[in-house]
Regions:
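Conserved S-adenosyl-L-methionine
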Residues: 109-117, 160-169
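Short Pro/Gly-enriched beta-strand edge/turn motifs at strand-loop
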Residues: 130-132, 162-176
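A Trp-anchored, charged/polar loop motif used as the substrate-binding/catalytic surface
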Residues: 44-56, 174-193
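Flexible, glycine-rich surface segments
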Residues: 199-201
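Residues that flank catalytic or metal-binding motifs in active/ligand-binding sites
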Residues: 4-9, 94, 143-146, 184-189
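Conserved beta strand-loop-helix elements of the APE1-like EEP
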Residues: 100-105, 138-163, 193-196
């Protein structure tokens, strides 16, 4: 195989909402109905079908690395559960759906891992937002907005040598009379080593 290059793809998975449902709220009492609308709107985008379509594109191009944006999770849990977010019933997991569909297509990919300090493990994902709120459906809704990098698992000749996850100093905020949400941004950096040509970031 020719290792004179590392092929990289970037893909926005689209979590299914831009949170416009909450942008114009005027009172806190309106918030649960907006959460319900976000929940139903996300599911209406047919996340599993979208993940399958993205998997077909990746399988066709077969890049070594794929950077995923808005690779989000949607979960539900007991109504009015206390902070921090704890809802665990998975309604959508775009990364898991994508990896499952890629496996079906014979194009195995996975998240990357590297050993961190004190026997910890660093994963090639980064959480931008992990928020949970009550809905009018009788349960809490939790949205976890993530970025991730996945890599081919059928190529042992390209090895991971470094993986770093960083935060931006500035944050995005959604603020109105009903709610204030802080969305920190950041990035994931990896270095893959190709035996004949050295590191490729």
């Amino acid at each position: 195989m020719d290792y004179d290059r590392v092929v990289v793809m970037t893909l926005n998975m689209d979590e299914g909402t831009d949170f416009k449902e909450i942008s114009g709220l005027q009172t806190p009492d309106q918030f649960p109905a907006a959460v319900t609308a976000i929940y139903h709107n996300i599911l209406a985008t047919k996340p599993d079908e979208r993940a399958a379509a993205m998997a077909r594109v990746i399988a066709e191009k077969h890049p070594d690395l794929v950077a995923l944006h808005e690779a989000s999770m949607l979960r539900t849990g007991p109504l009015n559960a206390p902070h921090p977010p704890s809802a665990s019933k998975v309604e959508m997991n775009l990364i898991s759906s994508l990896l499952r569909e890629l496996e079906k297509l014979g194009a195995p990919y996975d998240l990357m891992y590297i050993s961190g300090p004190a026997q910890s493990v660093i994963e090639s994902t980064r959480t931008n937002l992990d928020a949970e709120a009550p809905s009018t459906c009788g349960f809490n809704v939790r949205i976890t907005d993530r970025d991730a990098i996945i890599a081919r698992t059928d190529n042992d000749d390209i090895q991971l040598t470094a993986l770093e996850v960083h935060d931006f100093s500035d944050v995005q905020t959604i603020t109105n009379p009903a709610v204030s949400i802080v969305i920190p941004g950041g990035w994931i950096q990896v270095v893959k080593w190709t035996p004949d040509f050295g590191p490729a970031a």
